[in-house]
Amino acid sequence: MFVAHSLPIAICFCVVTMLGWGSWANTQKLSGKAHWPFQLVYWDYAVGVLLCTILFTFTLGSHGPAGMAALANMQTMTASFMLPALISGVIFNLSNILLVVGIDSAGMAVAFPIGVGLSLVLGTAFSYIQTPKGQPGLIFSGLALIIVAMILSSVAHRRLPKAEATNPRKGIIASILAGLVQGFFYPQLMRSISPDFSSSPILPGTLTPYVALVFFALGVFFSNLLFNTLFMRTGGVTYAEYFRGTLRLHSIGVLGGIIWMIAFSFNIIASSVAGPTISYALGQGATLIAALWGLLVWHEFRDDRAVPGNWSRSCLWAMRSAWAASRRLQDRSPALELTVYLEPPSKGEK
């Protein structure tokens, strides 16, 4: 299977994660311009996640000298390791639907910093407890700065005109709930994956990252039948509306799922080199990317009378500074140096 063998490659994968996770929600914004409800977008999103995972599993996950091919791994895995991957997909799906509700109500520039920022704090903390790599003082100092960025986003939202959000309080509450739930999915998924899969044999019963992502995607897809159906009923949306959608609208949602899953796959692959804590934290720089999309492309704070330009720019700069400082603090962790993949010595070397 395809794996990352060096720190520079792992860091590049985390950058891809950051860009993908921060950009996929643009597909929801594009669909919303056509008055396509988020509940319907999310069906196509789940399809995109599943299709991308299957494609990666039988291409990147089945070729290469490292680890174990996907089909062979499926024959040796046990339920005790498969179930955590499936459950992590269910947990993530609930949290992500709540985040989509937050984006739909409060905008990307607000929902992402609150929801994903809170998820980052919890997910990084739980990942560190599960796999303690790095200096906790530096890591948690970085997380404290991320909390500052979340607070600044909430403060900026109070200056947002009411016309910019359909239900701002609902959006903030949904984003907070999304962050609280989403913080648990990443450590849950890592429980199912064989440790050090890029440089060590796959442990009996455990899953390769590609197979784990298949069950994660299945958890997302099938839990959607419950979670999204409930959101459809509360929102007055019917399945008939979904099937009346155009090919373009469905394609946009599928594209969003593919973008998100590509980013997540690269993050999991990088985790063997950088460690789950660092990999997850670096990838969640997506919050800044999403805020930039919301502010600079979708102009979510465009009313200068309610949100003076200097104020919005100051908040954005402060958010960027907090995120950059947190990244620097986390990057200084020696775990990044200790977990670099080293080629095994040849037979003639000691």
Language-model features: locations:
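Polytopic alpha-helical membrane proteins, predominantly small-molecule transporters/carriers
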Residues: 1-341
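Short, intrinsically disordered C-terminal tails of secreted or membrane-associated proteins
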Residues: 343-349
